């Protein structure tokens, strides 16, 4: 949950912070297929009409970083050339992960372990978590998105769910929220993709 915290010193100085407090241990629903690799098992599950949560271990794209607007590629020419993050804060995937439409400090340990996929060819897909590219390139970059694949439903999240996870409470809570969403009846993606589009998205770099 989001908690406002204030500190005043002799009525002269005033500071205010937002603090995010998450449960230590939670049990998430598991009525879906969980995968770390896009492979034939994932394709078969989708063709059988199953729900799939794919958190790819290896994915093409740009490694993201959390940075304030000052540290942007307009002023500093350095990778990943991203100027911010746009979040669909009203999406039910965030039902148990309070967020605004921009990346506040609870996104630090998520974005520093994430990859933004280039989704230019997926014209109908709007990312749920989207990295904002510099105006020089203006690529459509997605960290999370969902789609209907035939009779199946797919949610892709490109953020490391394992590395240093004991030190990343926000990532644990985001995973919990996403897992419960994917397992729920609310997980009914509207936009459709074809298997060949996923194949191209995950094809090895030449």
What are these regions (language model features)?
Residues 26, 30-77, 148-155, 178-181:
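Short alpha-beta junction capping motif
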Residues 12-30:
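Short beta-strand elements
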Residues 170-182:
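Short amphipathic C-terminal alpha-helix that caps PH/PH-like domains
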Residues 13, 38, 139-141:
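Residues that act as N-cap/strand-start positions at coil-to-secondary-structure junctions
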Residues 1, 58-63, 71-169, 186-206:
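Catalytic beta-strand/loop cores that center a nucleophilic Ser/Cys/Thr
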Residues 2-9:
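Short, small-residue-biased leader/transition segments that mark boundaries at the very start
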Residues 10-13, 148-150:
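Short strand-coil-strand connectors
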Residues 25-28, 183-191:
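Short, charged low-complexity linker/loop segments at the C-terminal edge of domains
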């Amino acid at each position: 949950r989001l908690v406002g915290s204030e500190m005043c010193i002799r009525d002269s100085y005033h500071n205010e912070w937002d603090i995010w407090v998450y449960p230590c241990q939670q049990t998430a629903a598991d009525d879906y297929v969980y995968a770390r690799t896009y492979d034939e098992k994932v394709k078969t599950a989708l063709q059988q009409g199953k729900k799939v949560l794919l958190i790819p271990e290896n994915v093409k794209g740009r490694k993201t970083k959390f940075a304030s607007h000052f540290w942007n590629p307009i002023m500093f020419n350095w990778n990943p050339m991203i100027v911010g993050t746009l979040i669909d804060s009203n999406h039910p995937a965030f039902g148990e992960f309070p967020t605004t439409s921009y990346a506040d400090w609870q996104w630090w340990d998520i974005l520093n372990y994430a990859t933004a996929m280039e989704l230019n060819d997926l014209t109908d897909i709007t990312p749920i978590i989207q990295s904002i590219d510099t105006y020089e390139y203006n690529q459509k970059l997605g960290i999370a998105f969902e789609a209907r694949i035939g009779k199946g439903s797919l949610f892709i999240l490109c953020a490391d769910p394992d590395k240093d996870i004991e030190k990343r409470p926000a990532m644990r809570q985001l995973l919990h929220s996403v897992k419960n969403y994917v397992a729920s009846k609310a997980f009914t993606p509207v936009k459709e993709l074809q298997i060949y589009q996923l194949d191209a998205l995950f094809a090895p770099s030449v």
